[in-house]
Amino acid sequence: MKLLSQRSDQWNFRYPEGKPFEQRFAKINLVPDNQNTSLAGMAMGLLLQIYDAGGYKYFEPEVKFCGISVKGVGIDDPHTDTWDADTVKVLGLLNSDWNYSDVGGGFMYDGKEYNLKPTSFIIFDSNKVHCATKIYTNKKRFAIDYAVKKI
């Protein structure tokens, strides 16, 4: 998925909404826009794997939004989303070789920093302030996020 997203020409700078352009980050909207059916299909397959691996305790696989974002050095993006109270976010890295201890790029939520490891996902209320933590390398951090219906 990371390789396909790197090759995509569908990146936008819409997020976080309401922030000046200089504070926005690159993102591909897969659902509902669905401009890239290959990436969207892979993303839905991944979400079902997350659901089967234990996500069913926290969410229904009813997707309201799915996107891939890229973050790098100098991207400081604390923000809140504006989803309904029945929505949670599922977030994970697409970089298979990302090493948080060496390069940073974790996840800050509710005042606590989390180490995002490749193949691991975090489920959270995105209506609370959250952001990527400082990245210490020129390498880009790719992440996929889903807005889904909370159980």
Tell me what each language-model feature is:
Residues 1-58:
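Non-heme Fe(II)/2-oxoglutarate
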Residues 52-151:
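Catalytic core of non-heme Fe(II) oxygenases with the double-stranded beta-helix
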